[in-house]
Amino acid sequence: KPAANSNPQSSIADRVAEKVASGQSFTANWLFDVANNAYGGTMADGTYSVKDAYDGMELGINKYLMNADFVKAGNGSLKDALNTLSDLQNILRNIPTQTKRTEEMESYQQFSTPPTIAFTAARLANITSDDVVLEPSAGIGGLALWGKAWGAKVYGNELSKRRLAFLNELGLDGTFNENAEQINNVLPDDIQPTVVIMNPPFSSTAGRMKTNKTANAKRHIEQALDRLQEGGRLVAILGRGMSDDAP
C-alpha cells in the first residue's frame, strides 16, 4: 500500500496538468491509479471517493488553463476566441467523462461547468485586469480561473469544505466557505465585485431541507446582484426552468 501524499489534491492535479500540457489523452483507470498513489489507498477501501479523483482531475486542468498562453489570448479578438475554443475542445477529447456520481453531487448539484462553456461565459463578461470578479458557487474554479488568467482580482466561494480544499489550490485572491443563497448578507463588506460569473445550482438548496425548486437558483442570482457594484456585469449559466417561457 503506497504512503498517502501530504497534499493528495495537488498531487493528482500536478500529474493531470502534465498530461494535458503534453497533449496526451488518459483514461479513468489512469486517473484512479494516480489517486490511489496520492491518497495511499483505493476507492474500494474507502480511502477516497470517485468525486475526489474527478475533482483532482478538474483542478489539474484548471491549473494548466490558468497559465496557458492560448487561454490568456482568449480575451482578445474573435479569431483568438475561436482558437481558444478549439484548443479547449481538443483537451476535452483527451480526458475521461465523469460517468460516476456521488450522493454529494446529486444533493448539491455539484456539476462542474465544462471549460468550453466556462470560457464562453467569461468572454461574455468582458473581464479585464481592472475588474474584481466573484464566483459565488466556485466548485473547483472552472469559472474563476478565467478572471485570474486575464489579470483580474478573483474571489471564489464554495459551500463544500471538501471542494474548498481543491479550490484553495488554485491561488485565487480569496476564498470563502458560505452558502451562496446568502452571499451578499455574509461576505465581508470590502468584497465589491465589478463582475459576477456564476453557474448556480439549477434547483437545489443547501441546508437540511434540500428542497428542489427553481426559486433557489433565483435566490442565488438576486443575492449576487445585490453584491455587484453599480455598473457591473453578471453572467449566469442557467437551466431551462429559468427561461422566459418556462411554465
Q: What are these model-predicted stretches?
A:
Residues 206-212:
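Surface-exposed cleft-lining segments at the edges of enzyme active sites
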Residues 5-168:
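Class I S-adenosyl-L-methionine
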Residues 121, 212-247:
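Conserved Class I SAM-dependent methyltransferase catalytic core
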Residues 204-206, 243-244:
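Short glycine-rich, flexible loops that bind phosphorylated cofactors or substrates
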